[in-house]
A protein has these predicted regions:
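Bacterial N-terminal signal peptides
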Residues: 1-7
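Beta-lactamase-like hydrolase cores
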Residues: 10-54, 278
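Structured C-terminal helix/loop/strand segments within mature extracytoplasmic catalytic/sensor domains
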Residues: 13-24, 132-134, 184-224, 229-294
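Soluble periplasmic/extracytoplasmic beta-strand elements of cell-envelope proteins
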Residues: 36-40, 49, 65, 86, ...
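Acidic helix-start/capping segments at beta-turn-to-alpha-helix junctions
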Residues: 42, 81-98, 133-134, 155-160, ...
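Active-site SXXK
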Residues: 45, 57-85, 250
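Conserved catalytic neighborhood of penicillin-recognizing serine enzymes
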Residues: 92-127, 135, 171, 175
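Mid-domain, small-residue-enriched loop/turn segments at the edges of structured enzyme/sensor domains
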Residues: 106, 127-186
């Protein structure tokens, strides 16, 4: 249970990352499921992980790779973010998002579709973007960044018709990655090296609009976080850039969760909230940022 609240927490000295590592490992070990994570101090250089090179299902977290690929193609003049995409009835898929409920024939820019893909994790919008850029290009972009385990397998809810890797798709679902690779992708975004400083800044601004506050950020108030979540029956994932006293990338993956209830306070979501809180307390928040102590 989250109780006490700490405002503007500032460590008296350099963050004790060894202690934080032990704390996160203890939380992960007590969880009824498989937990992998990676933490990176972008500015200070400290980094540590648990199951960091193990492959995990991403659920909707893989949409970050789609966003990066889209902006990379725009950066190189192969598409424009203002290019129109038209919503057809055949494009609509269920799950998260709003486009499913809007009228067929609606036209929006690919930029707006990508915004919905991140802010609302809109599945239909994601497929519109993937139609524009192709799944194969996401693999090529991830390879160019050295992220060879980070893959989009198929369009959302259309595995049977669009899978580019049938066996991996059946094993991991929509996408796969490792904690270290996804942490590296967010580190590159923070450093302006994923696409370009301007494009990366724009993507981080989009990621800050993420509406899902039930995982890593659930114990934080007035703390800037650029992140993306993912959820499936036995999967919860969240990865993002935390703007603390230093910029910190935090990625947590849970799989094979015993508690598969679709409620706010299921075990993996509570776990991830505690892990996010521990990181924020260790590195210290700024301004009016507060953390509810586990």
């Amino acid at each position: 249970m989250l109780t006490a609240c700490f405002a503007g927490t500032v460590p008296a000295q350099r963050p004790d990352t060894a202690r934080l590592h032990r704390t996160l490992d203890s939380l992960a070990a007590a969880h009824h499921g498989v937990v992998g994570y990676a933490v990176r101090d972008v500015d200070g250089g400290a980094r540590f992980s648990r199951r960091g090179d193990e492959t995990f299902p991403t659920a909707s977290l893989i949409k970050v790779a789609v966003l990066v690929t889209l902006y990379d193609l725009a950066e190189h003049g192969q598409i424009s973010l203002d290019d129109p995409v038209t919503l057809l009835s055949i494009d609509k898929v269920g799950g998260s998002g709003v486009l499913y409920n809007l009228h067929s024939g609606l036209t929006l820019s690919v930029r707006d579709a990508s915004q919905l893909m991140i802010q609302l994790s809109d599945n239909t919008a994601t497929n519109l973007v993937l139609e524009k850029i192709s799944i194969g290009r996401t693999a090529a972009k991830m390879d160019s960044l050295g992220l060879r385990s980070t893959r989009v397998h198929h369009q959302v809810m259309l595995r049977q018709y669009t899978s580019v890797a049938r066996d991996s798709s059946e094993k991991y679902g929509l996408g796969k990655t490792t904690p270290n690779e996804m942490a590296q992708l967010f580190t590159l975004l923070a450093q302006g090296k994923a696409v370009s400083p301007k494009a990366d800044s724009a993507m981080l601004a989009v990621l800050e609009t993420n509406d899902d506050s039930e995982l890593l950020v659930r114990a934080l108030s007035n703390v800037r976080v650029a992140h993306k979540t993912g959820a499936d029956d036995d999967v919860r994932t969240d990865c993002g850039l935390f703007y603390l006293k230093t910029r910190v990338v935090v990625c947590v993956f849970t799989n094979k969760n015993a508690d598969q209830r679709w409620i706010v306070d299921n075990e993996p979501q509570r776990l991830m909230g505690r892990m996010g809180a521990e990181v924020a307390m260790a590195f210290g928040t700024t301004g009016k940022g507060t953390v509810e102590k586990p």
